[in-house]
């Protein structure tokens, strides 16, 4: 079997907003990598045995006395090192160079003139002339290196940053003041490929097929002939976990699908058809709508609703697990960003917006071993694996759906009547987005039920019914988002269909708030 972890890159995180993007680019190249906080020990690095090390950017300044530094062992480990932005600055300082606060802060596009050949820039240029090859890059820095460490040479320069890139070819140390991991740097992926493949010598074994083979083998080794239980929601993560486990242990996997009454139109039936009928999984559907809605009755606070939905899910799941007396393992769809954020919340090294339900979400009394086949994977990698396992593209590429479901898209108190109206309105919106080709152009689109009534006119009569808000956004990372400029005729068609086809809705509005200041979800 292919050893997909044989060659690996260690990325030390100094707090940059782009650090996870570095890891995703390295994985995209086909090489395994892990992202660790900057203050790791020499022993931890030795045990990980990286083939190369990347130092990330940071919002900190190297000119500040207590700003973070790379462990000294990084530069004594006899492996190539690439410093990006702050990573280049701390490399320079720690090896005897000098950094200063720049008179001209650089944020945005820049053109770096390349000089003195370096393996890092081999066969790279964007707008070269015979005398001066250049790279179009993305800068984001306020400090700069003003004196090189011994044995380094300048390999890139801009008018305001004379040392925009540097290298020590003998020790294979490289620094770039720009960000190769962002798409704005046109040749960024090629530059990282030069470092990871050509300089570090990593083989590109991190592929969907190899990851599946490795995951199946590890599951078999971990659980043997034991039985495993999985809460299958129909979302991408739990679906991929289910298929990996099914491939590894077959009928020893017990999937529990909790139908909480807060799902999209016909979603419960679709989950059963997909995983029960098509893939032949051992799956139990639990109709818990009345239990969830009963607990939510009279509750309007969003955070309280989230906690109730989470608690009831655990209770229902626990009731089902007790019926399976031979189960020894619990499978979860934890993915790598969950692990990173959970670790950060414990160490205080990063600001975490929300805790994830997949990390440590079940009570201590459920004394089962944990199986987490996706723990090393980013979301885009999970999708690729899902496609390779046979999940339909329409399902894999579906827009995100919140864990509490319609519980946080019905504003205020959640009632069955409201959920039923919202389900039908949302189905019309998504159907028209797909028919018009706009579903793929938006990152997330959904409907929200507003608990206010509005006067409308139907025929010769007046009606006093509920309001639906439509929401569609475009985003790269969901940290910021722009409202999608959907065509007026499309919005008009959706509005007319909802008001005419969903009895109980009298008005449809479109949310044109960006993030920030608004969040993507209303609750």
Swiss-Prot record:
Residues 8-205 form the Glutamine amidotransferase type-1 domain. The active site is at 85 (nucleophile), 179, 181. CDD domains: GATase1_GMP_Synthase (cd01742), GMP_synthase_C (cd01997). Gene3D superfamilies: 3.30.300.10, 3.40.50.880, HUPs. It comes from the Bacteria. Keywords: ATP-binding, Glutamine amidotransferase, GMP biosynthesis, Ligase, Nucleotide-binding, Purine biosynthesis. Residues 206-398 form the GMPS ATP-PPase domain. Pathway: Purine metabolism; GMP biosynthesis; GMP from XMP (L-Gln route): step 1/1. GO terms for cellular component: cytosol. Its EC number is 6.3.5.2. Coiled coil: none annotated. The keyword Nucleotide-binding applies. Catalyzes the synthesis of GMP from XMP. HAMAP family: GMP_synthase. Homodimer. NCBIfam families: guaA_Cterm, guaA_Nterm, PRK00074.1. PANTHER family: GMP SYNTHASE [GLUTAMINE-HYDROLYZING], GMP SYNTHASE-RELATED. This is GMP synthase [glutamine-hydrolyzing]. It comes from Haemophilus influenzae (strain 86-028NP). The lineage of its organism: Bacteria, Pseudomonadati, Pseudomonadota, Gammaproteobacteria, Pasteurellales.
């Amino acid at each position: 079997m292919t050893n997909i972890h044989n060659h690996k890159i260690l990325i030390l995180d100094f707090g940059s907003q782009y650090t996870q993007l570095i890891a995703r680019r390295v994985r995209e190249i086909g090489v395994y990598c892990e992202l660790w906080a900057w203050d790791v020990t020499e022993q931890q690095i030795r045990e990980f045995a990286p083939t190369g090390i990347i130092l990330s950017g940071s919002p900190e300044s190297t000119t500040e006395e207590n700003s973070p530094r790379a462990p000294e062992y990084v530069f004594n480990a006899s492996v190539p090192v690439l410093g990006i932005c702050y990573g280049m600055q701390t490399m320079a300082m720690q090896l005897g160079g000098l950094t200063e606060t720049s008179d001209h802060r650089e944020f945005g596009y820049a053109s770096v003139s390349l000089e003195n050949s370096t393996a890092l820039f081999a066969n790279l240029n964007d707008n070269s002339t015979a005398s001066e090859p250049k790279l179009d890059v993305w800068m984001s820095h306020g400090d700069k290196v003003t004196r090189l460490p011994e044995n380094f040479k300048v390999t890139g320069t801009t008018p305001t940053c004379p040392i925009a890139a540097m290298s020590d070819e003998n020790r294979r140390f490289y620094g770039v003041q720009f960000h190769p991991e962002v798409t704005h740097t046109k040749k960024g992926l090629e530059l990282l490929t030069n470092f990871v493949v050509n300089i570090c010598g990593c083989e590109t074994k991190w592929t969907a097929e190899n990851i599946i083979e490795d995951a199946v083998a590890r599951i078999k080794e971990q659980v043997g002939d034991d039985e495993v239980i999985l809460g299958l929601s129909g979302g991408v993560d739990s679906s991929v976990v289910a298929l990996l486990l099914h491939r590894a242990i077959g009928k020893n996997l017990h999937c529990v699908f909790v139908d909480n009454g807060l799902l999209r139109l016909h979603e419960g039936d679709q989950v059963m058809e997909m995983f029960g009928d098509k893939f032949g999984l051992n799956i139990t559907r639990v109709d818990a709508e009345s239990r969830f809605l009963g607990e939510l009755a009279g509750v309007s606070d969003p955070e309280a609703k989230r906690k109730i939905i989470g608690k009831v899910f655990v209770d229902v799941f626990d009731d089902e697990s007790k019926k399976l007396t031979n189960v020894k393992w619990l499978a979860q769809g934890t993915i790598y960003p969950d692990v990173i954020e959970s670790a950060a919340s414990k160490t205080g090294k990063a600001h975490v917006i929300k805790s994830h339900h997949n990390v440590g979400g079940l009570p201590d009394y459920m004394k089962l071993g944990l199986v987490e086949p996706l723990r090393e994977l980013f979301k885009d990698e999970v999708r690729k694996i899902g496609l390779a396992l046979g999940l339909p593209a329409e399902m894999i590429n579906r827009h995100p759906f919140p864990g509490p479901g319609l519980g946080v898209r019905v504003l205020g108190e959640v009632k069955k009547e409201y959920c039923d109206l919202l389900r039908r309105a949302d189905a019309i919106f998504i159907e028209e987005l797909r028919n018009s080709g706009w579903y793929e152009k938006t990152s997330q689109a959904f409907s929200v039920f507003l608990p206010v009534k509005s006067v409308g006119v139907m025929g010769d009569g007046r009606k006093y019914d509920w309001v639906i808000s439509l929401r569609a956004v475009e985003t790269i990372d969901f940290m910021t988002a722009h409202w999608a400029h959907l065509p007026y005729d499309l919005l008009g068609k959706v509005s007319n269909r909802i008001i005419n086809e969903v009895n109980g809705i009298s008005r449809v509005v479109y949310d044109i708030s960006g993030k920030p200041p608004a969040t993507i979800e209303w609750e």
